[in-house]
Swiss-Prot record:
Transfers an acetyl group from acetyl-CoA to L-homoserine, forming acetyl-L-homoserine. Keywords: Acyltransferase, Amino-acid biosynthesis, Cytoplasm, Methionine biosynthesis, Transferase. Belongs to the AB hydrolase superfamily. MetX family. It comes from Mycolicibacterium paratuberculosis (strain ATCC BAA-968 / K-10) (Mycobacterium paratuberculosis). It is an enzyme of class 2 (transferase). Residues 52-356 form the AB hydrolase-1 domain. It comes from the Bacteria. This is Homoserine O-acetyltransferase. The keyword Phosphoprotein does not apply. Pfam families: Abhydrolase_1 (PF00561). Its main location: cytoplasm. Pathway: Amino-acid biosynthesis; L-methionine biosynthesis via de novo pathway; O-acetyl-L-homoserine from L-homoserine: step 1/1. GO terms for biological process: homoserine metabolic process; methionine biosynthetic process. It is found in: Cytoplasm. The lineage of its organism: Bacteria, Bacillati, Actinomycetota, Actinomycetes, Mycobacteriales.
Length: 392
């Protein structure tokens, strides 16, 4: 994606991509990323008091295109189409939905495939970043747009990790949050599976130490294998067995070099990602997920969570293998502003936060009720003092 010479410093037209220049960013680890741009989209009108912004935060391979058809700059349709629009859970007749492409991504924001001032891609020079760094970049982009406080942050998976960092690190900037399919820190299981995905990419000869962007050779095979592995953690075990079992793929015979149906499905998922995503961004963002720990430098997870007054709804999925329900239960128990833990009974696994539209829509509506009940700041537990668990 080409960034225009003059970046947008006002919100773009509805559904269009704008590019906000935030200057240099110093990461949590002390590295400096110069000339940072953040891609932004919005739906709905900003109120005169600028108090109706709902920040929608995407997952690992998502982008700012939350809703709308595929088109120029949008290789795929919106990833949460049913959640944003007139009359939708994020009702754009009332709310202004704003989404960024995350720092380190490859859909308009500065990342490994972006060119530096020397005209060359960042490649291996792009530093490791954290979820916290991503949030700092988002906050800087919104500040450049004249938005210093938001009504709510909502997100699942990596987007949920970003939402958690928002409410813990910047409670005065956000009135409510929705934390979907996420935990307070990365688990050993997550780190193990994600390190294996990174290894698959880096073992591809075309990786070239991360400096492949101008060579005409890209680590597509490694990225596709990483995606296949990841996709297994995104879907539910019962769902996969119900859909595919041990069936062969159409007229192929696995006993004679043919494929299983589930094998073909995973290969297709890998090919789809390679067509739209950069391997360098996949590595950088996965490393950020591995380092996720809301308690780092805050006295540990419990202390960090207990210090956060922001009203929240926490959502989990019964069949989530990547972020199992116990992680959302911990968030609900430790966050004093948690109004409700909503548990979605679904066979779809971690991806339930993307496909269980009715249940997720209800969570968003409840989150925005919390946002609407707050004044200029979180100001205590408020509605969050009434904790409960709802199963859907």
């Amino acid at each position: 994606m080409t960034i225009p010479d003059v970046p947008t410093q006002t919100l773009p037209d509805e559904g269009e991509i704008g590019f906000v220049h935030i200057g240099s960013l110093t990461t949590e680890a002390g590295a400096v990323i110069d000339d940072v741009h953040i891609a932004v989209q919005r739906w709905g009108e900003l109120s005169p008091t600028r108090d109706n912004v709902v920040v929608v935060l995407h997952a690992l391979t998502g982008d700012s295109h939350v809703t709308g058809p595929a088109g120029p700059g949008h290789p795929t349709g919106g990833w949460w189409d049913e959640m944003v629009g007139p009359g939708a859970p994020i009702d754009t007749d009332r709310w202004c939905a704003v989404a960024t492409n995350v720092l380190g991504g490859c859909r308009g924001s500065t990342g490994p495939s972006s060119r530096t001032r020397d005209g060359k891609p960042w490649g291996s020079r792009f530093p490791r970043i954290s979820i916290r760094d991503q949030v700092e970049a988002d906050i800087a982009a919104l500040a450049a747009l004249g938005i210093d406080e938001v009504a709510a942050v909502v997100g699942g998976s990596m987007g949920g990790a970003r939402a958690l960092e928002w409410i813990v690190g910047h409670p005065s900037r956000v009135r409510a949050g929705l934390l979907l399919a996420v935990g307070a820190r990365a688990t050993a299981d997550q780190i193990g599976t994600q390190c294996t995905q990174i290894a698959a990419i880096k073992s591809d000869p075309n990786w070239q130490g991360g400096d492949y962007h101008d060579t005409g050779r890209t680590p597509d095979a490694g990225l596709a294998i990483a995606r296949r592995f990841a996709h297994l953690t995104y879907r539910g075990e019962v769902e996969l067995d119900t859909r595919f079992g041990n069936d062969a793929q159409l007229d192929e015979d696995p006993a004679n070099s043919g494929r299983y149906a589930v094998q073909s499905y995973l290969e297709y998922q890998g090919v789809k990602l390679v067509e739209r995503f950069d391997a360098g961004s996949y590595v950088v963002l996965t490393e950020a997920l591995n380092s996720h720990d809301v308690g780092r430098a805050r006295g540990g997870v419990r202390k960090a969570l207990r210090s956060c007054p922001v009203p929240v709804v926490v959502g989990g999925i019964t069949s989530d293998r990547l972020y199992p329900l116990r992680l959302q239960q911990e968030l609900a128990e430790q966050l004093p502003g948690c109004a409700e833990l909503q548990v979605v009974d679904s066979i779809c696994g971690h991806d339930g936060f993307l496909v269980e539209s009715e249940a997720v829509g209800e969570m968003i509506r409840k989150t925005l009720l919390l946002a609407g009940s707050q004044s200029a700041g979180p100001g205590g537990a408020g509605p969050g003092s009434r904790k409960g668990t709802t199963r859907r």
